[in-house]
Amino acid sequence: MKQKHILKWLGIALGAYLLYAVLTAIFVPLPQKEAAGELWSQYEARLSTDASQERVRSIEDTDSALLWRLQLIESAEREVVFSTFDLRADGSGQDLMAALYGAAQRGVRFYDPIDLLRPWKLNYRLHDKYLIADGSKYILGGRNSNDLFLGSYQENQNIDRDVLVVSDGGEGSSVSQLLTYFESVWSQPENKTITGKTSSQTDALQERYAALCAVHGKELAAVDWEVETAAVTHVSLLSGSPRAEAKAPELWDALVRLMAQGDDILLQTPYIICNDKMYNDLEALAETRQLRVLTNAVENGANPSGCSDYLREKQNILSRGVDVYEVVCGQSLHTKTILIGNDLSVVGSFNADMRSAYLDTELMLVIESEEVNAALRQESVQYIDQSRLALHDGGTEYGAQFEEVTLPWT
């Protein structure tokens, strides 16, 4: 009887805690803050200063994405900074860890580890994805660190984009902005440094690193970074708050102001999950300029909640004057890019959703270059050709290579 009594009270306690966790996860972030325009003011101030000498290359395919990361790590002589949302112990994840182990061990820290007394903080994710070598070169974008995004370890892969930036490391450079941002995240009081004994897996990592060098020795040799990149007019980092808390949508506000600079906007995002404020912003943009969204069709997406929300909100989105390319290409689109006019390209981790705007840490890189903008617009053509274009006037057009896919439940 005593044992049953204890189990009963344990069940009640567990149920009460789960209810507490669910309710706080819903209601703590519910009051949504407003942007004050601070991030936009910082961005405008940077434009008034002399631009640093920085060069850029876009990284479009998974094999190149893994190889450039390995090359960047191999080139480091002093320091490597690595921040990622989703690192797995699969093929590409082990490749990265082997390369990092081969370069240096500089400490590992978890952003906002689990706090059982404040379970709502699980809502706030470190969604940044970047890798910096020696304070002079970095890769930043939307790719996570696993086989869905890197290498050729599995057949099914996501479509995504990174940019490689080579910098002079000057005071106003984007790499200095990124390092400052990293330090602000690294120093958050909630973070936890992981310590412990040397893992028994270090020998395996050393062997894997040796194998990587044997296979990719030529590619991992000294890289002519200038030849591999193109000069651009200006590069600047936009970042949200590093705190693990509900955030003012400063980054979204800055992106909207940026989009207002052009008359032809292509917004690439895996899904669209907005509140009225965000939809109103899109509507205001679409009133005086062409605004088109390139996103996954319901039958193409890998995010069930994103797809279901788009089904529910599709007519609302179209009524705002936005045209939507619904991609059906056999691979889930994970790209987060905004192409503005003929000279601005914005690439990073920010999805067009409330989580990116109000909860998670996010980074977007603003690149001023007609050459880069033209190249990224050309890259998008293959997905536009495989899309169904839902027009805001109620019409529908089909790309030259669009193929209808029947959903299994229809």
Name the predicted role of every residue range.
Residues K2-D128, A133-T410:
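Charged, low-complexity intrinsically disordered terminal segments
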